[in-house]
Regions:
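Thiol/selenol-based redox catalytic cores and closely related redox-interacting motifs
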Residues: 34-126
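Local sequence-structure signature of Cys/Sec-based thiol-disulfide redox active-site neighborhoods
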Residues: 1-23, 27-32
């Protein structure tokens, strides 16, 4: 199952959701401001990201800038707690399934969410 972490008013989030719908891919949307992410979800996001916090945390977010926060100095427990209470620091959208992890909307990379058997059919038709 594809999970999409979104926020209201996010243009890239809308692009991802529209692309998934156009390609008839089922997904579960989680608005990070409507539901509080649990600790295991946050740890899972951190584990799945290739570059740790750099991939999923916006260092330019208001709370990080105004408070001069260095997430690299935090323990995992502190980081998870920080994200849980400040979801606005997460880059959006975050899209993942069992095999693929994507932050943001990238027209080429998002194709990885199409199952291999369907990708082969598309390529064969070309």
């Amino acid at each position: 199952m594809i999970v999409v972490y979104t926020s209201p008013g996010c243009a890239s989030c809308r692009k991802v959701k529209n692309w998934l719908k156009e390609n008839n891919l089922k997904f579960l949307e989680k608005n990070i401001f409507q539901i509080q992410l649990n600790q295991s979800e946050i740890k899972h996001l951190l584990m799945r990201s290739e570059n740790g916090t750099d991939d999923i945390i916006s260092k330019r977010s208001k709370i990080i800038q105004e408070n001069n926060i260095d997430v690299e100095e935090m323990s995992i427990t502190e980081l998870v707690d920080f994200i849980q209470h400040n979801p606005s620091v997460l880059k959006r959208p975050i899209v993942l399934n069992e095999k693929t992890f994507l932050v943001g909307y990238d027209e080429e990379e998002i194709g990885a969410f199409i199952p291999a058997d369907r990708r082969e059919k598309v390529i064969t038709r070309l």
